[in-house]
Amino acid sequence: MTAALPDLSFHPAWHAQLELAYARAGDATRPVTRRHAGPLRVQKHLYAEGPEVCQHILVHPPGGIAGGDSLAFDVRLGERAWAQLTSPGAAKWYRAACPARQTLEIHLEPGATLEWLPQESIVFAGAQAELETRIQLRGDARLFYWDMVALGRPASGERFASGHFVAALDIRRDDRLLWHERQRIDGGDRLLDSPIGLAGHPVLATLVASGEIDTDLLQRCRALPCAGRGNLSQLPGGLLVARCLADEALHARAWLIELWRLLRPALLGREAVPPRIWST
């Protein structure tokens, strides 16, 4: 049975901001700024791997994003700080008569490491979701970033027949552009089923990591089983980019996690320890 969508006819728009900053103090990473306005919060503050890696679980208590809403994240890491940011569940973008927006600004100083590992975004039919991410790396800062998007509700048989999804991603190192991407997917567009588009897969995922790996590890990553279509490329400028198309978000998530398990020791020098929230 398909669950009814919430009635958002009289939904008051939420304008939420979350500003986070981290600094290295001795052998530990400490949060030095944690400011919020509106319904964006840090739910938990953890050191599951010891003091060097600060893990924060970010939550949006309303549980969904509707027309007129805006969410803004600003994340800054000082030299040699290490933060891992994730979420407890999927972000839901509801159908709406006007756009809802999310912006993410990331600034990493030399030697800093950020793992941005949220769970998926579900963009319901009729939603107007617009996301913009800008990342600035300084010196030898390290990044491990992913995002997953489910268009419609595949598990309920709901296609993305109306609305739109727009996403932009810019990554720079010392102001030099390393990666620029802008995509727009309109509900009902032929590209949803075209072999040069999503080929009928309603879930798309992207992983971007800074650094270079040897040919053997690259082949091991490419050999990982994927319940969909997945591949990984080493790009000039020291970026690894992985793509996945899948029929369900859990399949894309499983593939990204396995990639992270393989790549984290090579790129970040630590074994992969999955956040416990992923298992709840």
Curated annotation (Swiss-Prot):
The keyword Chaperone applies. InterPro entries: UreD (IPR002669). GO terms for cellular component: cytoplasm. GO terms for molecular function: nickel cation binding. It is found in: Cytoplasm. UreD, UreF and UreG form a complex that acts as a GTP-hydrolysis-dependent molecular chaperone, activating the urease apoprotein by helping to assemble the nickel containing metallocenter of UreC. The UreE protein probably delivers the nickel. Belongs to the UreD family. Required for maturation of urease via the functional incorporation of the urease nickel metallocenter. This is Urease accessory protein UreD. It comes from Pseudomonas aeruginosa (strain ATCC 15692 / DSM 22644 / CIP 104116 / JCM 14847 / LMG 12228 / 1C / PRS 101 / PAO1).
